[in-house]
Amino acid sequence: VTKLVLGVMGKLRSRPALGPSAQSIALPPPEKHGGLPLLDALAQRRSGRDFKPDVLPLPMLSTLLWAAWGINRPEEGHRTAPSAIDCQEIDLYVALPTGAYLYDAKAHALHLAAAQDVRRVTGYQDFVDQAPLDLVFVADHARMTPVPAGERERYAAVAAGAIAQNVYLFAPSAGLSTVIRAWIDRAALSEALALSHDQQVLLSQTVGFASR
């Protein structure tokens, strides 16, 4: 039975975590200097769908998450990607083999959201099951009260797109491959991450070392 059929049947589920699920993971300080020049990173930006299962080293994961949606102006709490009226409405979930975690930008740490291997629920493509990291972009509409209700999904989608592009630009500097995906069983993923009714799954993004 394919993952798509399981999704249609409402039976696409997480798998047991591949190892102990730590309640929190303190990330080392991110590398904020160096990397490819911007124009070189743009020239190398591409989507890849063939991944090795090798886990990303923690320092690399730390810098990736900071580049994606970290705090780059601590005195103001502003981030590496824009958000309308500075709502900072995007929650970035990190699906690892050992569990799913919420990225806490202020503490620069990961907090356990689900002690399960949620990767297979982040998309219908087979490669999401084996890649070491799947990012899930979730909009929290409760933080968007200054934005008109009819505009919130659109504004959040723009913010998620900016974060995803940060990941795309970081990837070639770190020798990584990535692809963003919208073909998702959002109901199953919301259940797996125990999201509230105010939280909306927007996109997923797979990251890892290219297998070819």
Language-model segments: residues:
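A glycine-rich helix N-cap at a beta->alpha junction
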Residues: 193-212
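Small-aliphatic-rich amphipathic alpha-helix that forms the alpha element of a beta-alpha
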Residues: 45, 64, 92, 133-189
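N-terminal amphipathic, basic helical "cap/leader" segment at the start of enzyme domains
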Residues: 1-131
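Solvent-exposed coil/turn segments that connect beta secondary-structure elements
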Residues: 97-98, 140, 210
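Short coil/turn connectors at secondary-structure junctions
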Residues: 129-133, 198-200
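Beta-rich nucleic-acid/ligand-interaction surfaces
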Residues: 82-86, 184-191
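Short, surface-exposed helix-loop/turn micro-motifs enriched in polar/charged residues
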Residues: 84, 178-181, 197
